[in-house]
Amino acid sequence: MAKIINFNDEARKKLEIGVNTLADAVKVTLGPRGRNVVLEKSYGAPLITNDGVTIAKEIELEDPFENMGAALVKEVAIKSNDVAGDGTTTATILAQAIVKEGLKMLSAGANPIFLKKGIELAAKEAIDVLKDKAKKIESNEEISQVASISAGDEEIGKLIAQAMAKVGETGVITVEEAKSLETTLETVEGMQFDKGYVSPYMVTDSERMTAELDNPLILLTDKKISSMKELLPLLEQTVQMSKPVLIVADDIEGEALTTLVINKLRGTLNVVAVKAPAFGDRRKAILEDIAILTGGEVISEEKGMKLEEATIQQLGKAKTVKVTKDLTVIVDGGGEQKDISARVNSIKAQIEETTSDYDKEKLQERLAKLSGGVAVIKVGAATEVEMKDKKLRIEDALNATRAAVEEGIVAGGGTILLDIIESMKDFNETGEIAMGIEIVKRALEAPIKQIAENCGLNGGVVLEKVRMSPKGFGFDAKNEKYVNMIECGIIDPAKVTRAAIQNSTSVASLLLTTEVVIANKKEEEKAPMGAGGMMPGMM
């Protein structure tokens, strides 16, 4: 396929148009007075959103060179979203500002390699200053403030803070669509998995159709149980101890199931059998998780173990187990805390190593069930369009909250970026490296100016007023006042700001050192052949 090649300023100008087109579409969403963007969908209703990365992902430009510029800034938003889960609009604005300032200097004859070095020096220093200024989250109220600012809704902020308080830092919080107008929070204690009793005759409460076992013994096996002979030695011991039993196996069928049900109905045995959750290797891993949580052992054929030789010591324990037709919940397992902690650390290491989003999600679920619990935020809305927008806001707020817990908080509303400029050390650099440092300093002013402009105010005037204000003061865009940002609860996660600075400077500095841009030449569509002429005399 033939290629089109652009060089020097011509190449960079085309890239800049793409950068500006995408950034201008995204930056209108910044701050509490930010606007929404409507995205056409190939099916269903349009999506109305103010989520930077969602908007960026939708943008494709017709001109291939401009599209490459847009794609580079799109990468900034996506990377920031992957690292911190929020701050994508800030990252996009910073990238646009660096490209704009940098291209001005290149047009004046600056060396792009030295400019890049200056940008990298300034970015590193900015991140070091940011880390020094970050304040550890100390209260549930601060978690609520971070979530409220990210979602643009105080009620959502409170809901997320409640969820974090219930499941802890390592617990999983999921977002689902509700069937009502209200947004609510549900929490699940203990380990829950999506498998219920294999027979309804095993219930202990026939009205609610649930089986509840107090202080049960828990038999775990990856084996399919079809013969009662395998279970008999172990069950005889549990009957002597008058203990209820939960059996978690690959499957329970045939004679074994019939005998268990008959003995349950006669009152000889208090037993509930459920199938093990998941499939294949994931099933084995979850069975091991349950074993560690309950202090038991998986009776595994792979390890050469036989069910008929299993002992009471190999069974797990729990305070209570509740089983419905499609759910099993184990509360207060009897496992050793050191074993559980070791398993948690092992799963965390696997999360760090995996590149698959699906595997990561499943590992996070296992981690939550072992260490904290699960909270579900059920999102209610009047229409599907509102539902999608609300869901995106809550997901962003959740990510921002986790980021704040991880690396602390800083003054919000772009105030920290001005603080960083003033606190940066003197680099003692001259020439084009100093110009690169100056590019970053000017770019860090862009977010606060944009927040003001989205309020209908002059960004330059607001910037100067903040500069003249006491330390820690910034622009409260919601109320259009100059206040102490942290005292008023206008805070941002340090991790989100760090990701925005890192990703914007990285991509923008690479764009500035671009000298040639190569794109595929579109093949012209051949015109369809016209209809053949008619023979003389034919109608």
Curated annotation (Swiss-Prot):
PANTHER family: 60 KDA HEAT SHOCK PROTEIN, MITOCHONDRIAL. It catalyses: ATP + H2O + a folded polypeptide = ADP + phosphate + an unfolded polypeptide. Belongs to the chaperonin (HSP60) family. The gene is groEL. Together with its co-chaperonin GroES, plays an essential role in assisting protein folding. The GroEL-GroES system forms a nano-cage that allows encapsulation of the non-native substrate proteins and provides a physical environment optimized to promote and accelerate protein folding. It holds the Pfam family Cpn60_TCP1. This is Chaperonin GroEL. PROSITE patterns: CHAPERONINS_CPN60. It comes from Fusobacterium nucleatum subsp. polymorphum (Fusobacterium polymorphum). One of its GO terms (biological process) is protein refolding. Forms a cylinder of 14 subunits composed of two heptameric rings stacked back-to-back. Interacts with the co-chaperonin GroES. Keywords: ATP-binding, Chaperone, Cytoplasm, Isomerase, Nucleotide-binding. Signal peptide: none annotated.
